[in-house]
């Protein structure tokens, strides 16, 4: 019999083992679709980003008008920009659901895969932040000023660090230039990290909703899950196109239609919606250094997930108390997101502080306690 090139060719063999003949647990649900959706998001963002970069000018005097020019005069430039801006929102929706799936089904016990995933999240957040600065509108400028200023909370070297990041004594042309450089570079770094993430995943194989070893019942990825993934792509691309075509500015800030002006501060400086939960946590501590540490902890806490797992069962499928806690955490994150978009005044301050306290309490204290309690309940 002639050798199958798919299985013998050095490059095709790798593709085959990752996407075609990959042994996959037969019972994984739609929650396992988000990994491939993230891949599609990344590809879409890189493609639209490259097309936008071809027409963008990283200069404070020209950045705003170059973006306007792209939307007005470039063939389908408006669509490319709208897809890129709203694609970022979908990227974050997918990654948050992907992380939620990982927490619910105990996927974090694959430590290497989980840790590279958290690094991917941090890189994505950095990419989105520097990208938001590029149109050089009011919120771009003041967002860059406020967030980079947080580095000044670092003891002793803080101020030097901030001025080094700015390339001067305030956010100006050098800042915009380096932010464009970073925004161009980081997605390729994300691609590399994604390959590492997948390499670690394919070492152990996928987890499944029951959290049990599935070696006895695996099926090839293609055609079973490749077909399921295509359905996922359609279900994601449809709302993305709808948003980009009918309501492209729904998730943006109206303030960003005004060119950056260092002499006028917007009444309420806030990041894009997908970073608001961390912003709300940062804001709920009335001390600069404390706020910065809480901001960092809000994401870095994910690294602790494998250490805080105390249950004898891997997933939450058969753990009703942990499920209740998990959905409380999800609701709490929505509250934090909402509070982050509100002005710093009563009652939003106290709501934000309570929600921040709840966030850390659930993850650090209640999850391990409930896990141990459910172990005890197994004996009765």
Swiss-Prot record:
Keywords: Electron transport, Heme, Iron, Membrane, Metal-binding, Mitochondrion, Mitochondrion inner membrane, Respiratory chain, Transmembrane, Transmembrane helix, Transport, Ubiquinone
Superkingdom per UniProt: Eukaryota
Metal-binding among keywords: yes
GO biological process: mitochondrial electron transport, ubiquinol to cytochrome c
Protein name: Cytochrome b
Function: Component of the ubiquinol-cytochrome c reductase complex (complex III or cytochrome b-c1 complex) that is part of the mitochondrial respiratory chain. The b-c1 complex mediates electron transfer from ubiquinol to cytochrome c. Contributes to the generation of a proton gradient across the mitochondrial membrane that is then used for ATP synthesis.
Encoding gene, per UniProt annotation: MT-CYB
Sites where the protein binds heme b b562: 84, 183
UniProt GO cellular component terms: mitochondrial inner membrane; respiratory chain complex III
UniProt subcellular location: Mitochondrion inner membrane
Misc. comment: Heme 1 (or BL or b562) is low-potential and absorbs at about 562 nm, and heme 2 (or BH or b566) is high-potential and absorbs at about 566 nm.
Quaternary structure and interacting proteins, as annotated: The cytochrome bc1 complex contains 11 subunits: 3 respiratory subunits (MT-CYB, CYC1 and UQCRFS1), 2 core proteins (UQCRC1 and UQCRC2) and 6 low-molecular weight proteins (UQCRH/QCR6, UQCRB/QCR7, UQCRQ/QCR8, UQCR10/QCR9, UQCR11/QCR10 and a cleavage product of UQCRFS1). This cytochrome bc1 complex then forms a dimer.
Membrane-crossing segments per the record: 34-54, 78-99, 114-134, 179-199, 227-247, 289-309, 321-341, 348-368
Molecular function GO terms recorded: metal ion binding; ubiquinol-cytochrome-c reductase activity
